[in-house]
């Protein structure tokens, strides 16, 4: 595990909030995951995170899928990254759109005209971008959201595979990754948010169960 997360983003502050909650924290519900230290571990973490997300989705009842998220009782359970997601579709689309952004970031570097990871208009307030990404997909069906995420996840795996170990894990190897490495960017749009999404869905299902118990007791 990395000794510090303080160097991540201004662009670097964003990575701090996106990459490390799953890797740096440990509690009774979720043991801290070792941060990938090589390409094989990175690819395994990406694949494992996606598999666990799908396992959690498969456990959801129709009621859990159709009932909007409600974290009003404990907003911290939701976190700022997911504050605009109101259902499973929103959550999956959110993941998909951040992976699209990652592909564009890498493609721009490889085509010789690199730019910062975040679009200029959202560099100081990326939460507004989160809101925009979710809002533009309000007519997207859930099954389409699942398909889009599956496609872009597979592209993320192939994209990560195309990098060498040095390119992935050398801090500052690419100018536009600043003081961190390319692997952290892959983590920030795959394994880390996959784990956060699983926790969010578990909390949603727990909230539904608690609400039903209160109704039954009343």
Residue ranges, per PLM feature:
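Extreme N-terminal tail/first-helix region
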Residues: 7-9, 18-19, 23-58
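Short amphipathic alpha-helical segments with heptad-repeat character
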Residues: 40-47, 92, 96, 143-146, ...
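Structural signal for well-ordered, non-membrane alpha-helices
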Residues: 50-61, 99-103, 107, 150-164, ...
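Short, contiguous alpha-helical
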Residues: 2-26, 72-128, 167, 171-218
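Short secondary-structure junction/hinge motifs that connect adjacent elements
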Residues: 59-78
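Solvent-exposed interaction patches of small proteins and small membrane subunits
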Residues: 37-48, 79-82, 112-114, 139-140, ...
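Acidic/histidine-rich alpha-helical segments that form the ligand environment
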Residues: 125-170
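A short small-residue
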Residues: 27-34, 76-78, 129-137
């Amino acid at each position: 595990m990395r000794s510090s997360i303080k160097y991540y983003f201004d662009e670097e502050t964003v990575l701090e909030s996106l990459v490390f909650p799953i890797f740096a924290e440990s509690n009774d519900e979720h043991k801290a995951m070792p941060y990938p230290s090589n390409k094989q571990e990175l690819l395994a973490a990406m694949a494992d995170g996606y598999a666990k997300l799908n396992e959690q989705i498969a456990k959801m009842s129709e009621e859990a899928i159709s009932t909007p998220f409600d974290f009003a009782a404990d907003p911290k359970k939701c976190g700022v990254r997911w504050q605009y997601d109101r259902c499973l579709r929103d959550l999956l689309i959110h993941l998909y759109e951040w992976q699209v952004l990652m592909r564009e970031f890498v493609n721009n570097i490889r085509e010789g005209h690199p730019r910062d990871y975040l679009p200029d208009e959202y560099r100081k307030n990326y939460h507004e971008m989160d809101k925009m990404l979710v809002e533009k997909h309000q007519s997207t069906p859930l099954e389409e959201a699942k398909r889009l995420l599956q496609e872009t996840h597979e592209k993320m795996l192939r994209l990560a595979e195309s990098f060498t170990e040095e390119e992935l894990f050398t801090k500052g190897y690419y100018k536009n990754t600043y003081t961190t490495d390319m692997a952290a960017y892959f983590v920030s749009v795959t394994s880390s948010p996959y784990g956060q999404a699983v926790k969010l869905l578990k909390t949603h299902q727990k909230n539904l169960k608690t609400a039903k118990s209160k109704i039954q007791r009343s």
